[in-house]
Every structure is written in structure tokens, then in C-alpha cells.
Amino acid sequence: MAHHSCGATHGVMERCDLACTSCYLGEEANASRPIEEAEVCRQFDALREFLGPQGKAQITSGEVTLMPREELGRYIRYAIDIGLDPMVMTHGRRFLEEPDYLRDLVELDGLEKISIHVDSTQRGRQEWSPFCTETELHPLRDRYARLIRDTRRQTGRRLHAAHTVTVHPRNLAQIPDVMQWMVRNLDAFRMISFQPVAEVGRTQDQSIENLTLDDVWEKVCGGLGTKINRDAMHFGHPECHIVTPVVVVRSGERFIVLETARKGKRWDRSYLRRLLDQVGGYTVRGKSRMTNILGITSLTLRNPLLLLETFLYGIYRSWGNRRELASVLLRAVKRGHLSVRPLVLVIHKFMSPGELDTPIGQERLAACTFKVPVNGKMISMCEMNATELRSKLYPRERIRKAG
């Protein structure tokens, strides 16, 4: 079974064609050539050893879609072949300009996961202005949602999409607007990650003084119209991130958010734990929907008591939300449409340089669940970006490429 953590590449393509006002890359990034393919594969090998089978590996660096599709495709195929679950991290501009680029990654190279970064820090986009709001970027987000739907339809393949948003002083109050857009587009995106600014790399935006995870979480909940338990699941240090899965039942503009583990509800947590113990090792990559349904059903049938509990728990949860569900279902009867979609809510708070050597910073580094392979070691992404380590790698990478 895979470790409960995530890893990432570096040096694959440090260059980026945007000039985001919040950027973890160093000043020399755009002059740094990509490292050799063999070295990238060694990074994947290290990630596979560290993360285990189906480990979540982000193919990231600067903007990796600046590479030829064939080259990025080779990295995706290699990661899959050695047993990783790769996700391409991108601002996605090339996908809009060349839709075939994404289609080929999905159809020819087996890509199943992407994360698209859109927010008001992204200087260089045609849609960007110094004072643009997140709401003004919704038409751009709509284009990506259509692209994802079109790619699935044209290829007949699975494509899971996440949305990444940097949180800075100017857009903190706009998070509810982004969440409301997200609810309307859960058929395209099923995960959203908010990442408060860290004063690293070539970042120009200031971090928000004394901003806590709870401050951001309050804005997320505001957009969903309900207070959600932030402690449904735990990964790493509690000051690093929040990861909370929910289910959204929606008809038109009316929706209800169903939590996986409500605060103070013991049965929620104990049932979730037993369910994950039973099916947590099952992987869906490379299998058809029917195969996955049969596989998960088979696992559940091996534990008749859990199957019975699932039935009873479903009644219990439906009764607890009967009024809200009735309102949505009545709307669905009138409109003839009802959707039930999963949504994973993520907040990831990277550290600035001044935080690393504090007692809490050292605790966070020791508990880190997001690492990159550097010189034979797995290094926290915070250590990679909040020190000179990333920049120190640039000259060596150029020398290796030239040699």
C-alpha cells in the first residue's frame, strides 16, 4: 500500500512563460535548461521507492507543458510503468492554445490527472490585469472546464482535474466566489487547493501576516454556505494543510454539502476508518468504471458486517440531512436534473524562510508529507523553496545538460 504522502519532481522544466507575482522559482529559473531525461527518471525511481505503489507524483517544476508533448509524454509513461500515479501541474495555457496537446497526453500517454492553476497573481495571461478579481477570471476557468469535458468526450478516457489557487492579500476575501464557481463545475473539477503566499523564490506579494489555516478554511466554508469539519482526515502536521473530502448534491443553484466525518459524530469517523481499512489499498488507475465498481463491491462483500453497516449508515446520514436533501430532491424533480459529485477541499500552507528554524517549523519539516528527491535524499518542499537549495541546483543542471 502506498504511503499517505505525495512527491514531486524538480528541474524538469524550471522555465515558465508567466511572471506570477507569487512564484516559488528562483531568479535564474528562466535561464536554467531542463535536466537530462535519465536524471528525471531517477527522480521517479526515488519517488516510487519512497511513496510505494500508486504513489502520488506531481510532474512539476516551472511550466512543464513548455516541453514538447512527446517528451512530457515519455515522463508520464515512465511514471505509470514503474507504478506511480502521476499528475501534471500546469497553468494550462498551452492546453487552450493547442487542445491536441492535452488530448494526446491522455489518449497516447495515459495521463489521468491534471491540476490547473488559475488566479489573480498570474501576470502574463491575456485575461490578467493588476487589479483583476477572481470573479473576473471565471470566464477563463470556464474555458478550462469545457476543455476537460471535451477531452474526456473526444478520447473516451478518464481525466481527473484539480484546481489550484494562490491566496494573497488581495484575493483572500474572494475565496467564497471561487468556491461557488467550483460547485457549478464539479463535473469538470473534483479537487481544489488553496495555497497561501509564502515569501520564497521571486515572489513579490507579501504573505498575509498571522494568517492561519482556519482563516482560509472559514472563507472556503463561506462559499459552501455551511461550516465543515476541517479535521475529517489528517496528513502530516496539522499546521501544514487541511484535506477534507465532501459530497455535493446539487440541482440547479440549490445544493447541499455532505461531510464525510462531521465534528463530534463518532460513527462518522469510525465508519470512515473501517471503510478505508477495507478498500483503502484498492487502486482505480488503468481500469474501467465497471471493473472498479465490481472490484470495490467484491472487497465490500468480503466483510458482510461492513456491508450491513454501510446500509444502516446511509439511512442514518439521510435522516440527519432529510430537510436539506428533500429541498434539493424536490428541485430535481421539477428540473429533471440531479448531480452527486465528490469534492476534495485542500489548503496547503508552505513556509517562508523565517519559519523554517522555529520550533514549529522544525516540527513541520519532520512531519512533512510532500517531498522531492535531491541528491539521494527526500527533501521537504518547504526546504526546497524557502532556502537557496532550488537556486543552487540551477547551475549544476545547466552544466549537466551542456556536458
Predicted ranges, named:
Residues G73-R77, L102-V106, A145, M179, ...:
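Short amphipathic alpha-helical segments and helix-helix/interface helices
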Residues I208, G225-T260, L393-A402:
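Catalytic cores of nucleic-acid editing and processing enzymes
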Residues P68-L72, E98-Y101, E127, L172-V178, ...:
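A short acidic (Asp/Glu
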Residues E27-P34, W128-L137:
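Short glycine-enriched, charge-decorated loop/helix-capping segments at active-site entrances
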Residues G55-Q58, G110-S115, P139-E239:
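Conserved C-terminal portion of the radical SAM core fold
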Residues D17, V64-L66, M87, G92-L96, ...:
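Conserved radical SAM core fold
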Residues M1, G252-G403:
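Radical SAM enzyme core and accessory elements
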